[in-house]
């Protein structure tokens, strides 16, 4: 009996190691509350940001097939719930705890079946005097709820470093940021996460002091990455008219918000 329990724990740890190895190089995703809603930003080579429902949005890192399966699951569930009852019943809490987490947790603990290789970030625009909310769902089904900032990255160390970078600015804890301020902070935080993952560089180590990530260094990282990737950013916007509060930032907006000009080689 003891031996079987040990083997199960060993299998769980092996699954954890496998998943973390698979998502280690994933492009970070940052969610920030600003003065007119919530911004979600990442750099990518293909779409990673989706509207879930009128006031809900999702992004993720991991295996594309797993992300798409979970996206469809939560989007379909939100649509059915909104149709059968009320849009007020379509909440981040309900979708996270009763739709997303159970199958993710089950697949992680079922050691004879493939695990779900994905980390998810969801955002909810506050309504009916409820505050904006950000939630991250880990590959094992555990969640973290935040009111101002949320990040997902290739490892917990990278995520901690990105949060530390935002915390040192004090801006990440305020809902008074303009959209441009939030964009600049989010994209610089993305660069911090990207640099932290470059273990081949002896100057960059996980857990390094965030003070070492000066703006010039971050901008150089972004300019290099934008040769192969593009910025994908979207907002859940309080002032937007209509039922849907989600919108993607235009190429013109992104270009105007970047702290440098994009050359012809950059996307």
Label every model-predicted segment.
Residues 1-267:
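Long, low-complexity N-terminal extensions
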């Amino acid at each position: 009996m003891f031996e079987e329990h040990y083997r199960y724990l060993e299998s769980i740890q092996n699954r954890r190691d496998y998943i973390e190895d698979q998502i280690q190089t994933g492009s970070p995703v940052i969610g920030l509350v600003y003065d007119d809603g919530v911004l979600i930003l990442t750099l990518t080579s293909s779409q990673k940001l989706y509207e879930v429902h009128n006031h809900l949005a999702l992004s993720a890192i991991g295996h594309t097939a797993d992300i798409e399966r979970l996206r469809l699951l939560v989007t379909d569930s939100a649509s059915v719930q909104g149709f059968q009852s009320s849009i007020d019943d379509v909440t981040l809490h309900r979708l996270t705890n009763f739709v997303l987490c159970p199958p993710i947790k089950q697949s992680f603990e079922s050691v004879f079946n493939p695990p779900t290789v994905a980390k998810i970030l969801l955002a909810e625009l506050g309504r009916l005097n409820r505050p904006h909310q950000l939630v991250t769902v880990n590959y094992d089904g555990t969640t973290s709820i935040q009111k101002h900032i949320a990040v997902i990255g290739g490892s917990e160390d990278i995520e901690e470093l990105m949060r530390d970078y935002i915390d040192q600015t004090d801006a990440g804890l305020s809902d008074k940021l303009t959209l441009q301020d939030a964009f600049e902070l989010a994209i610089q935080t993305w660069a911090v996460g990207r640099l932290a993952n470059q273990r081949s560089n002896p100057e960059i180590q996980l857990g390094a002091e965030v003070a070492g990530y000066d703006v010039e260094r971050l901008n150089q990282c972004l300019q290099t990455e934008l040769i192969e990737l593009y910025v994908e950013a979207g907002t859940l916007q309080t002032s937007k008219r209509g039922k849907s509060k989600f919108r993607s930032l235009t190429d013109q907006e992104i270009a105007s918000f970047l702290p440098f000009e994009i050359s012809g080689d950059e996307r």
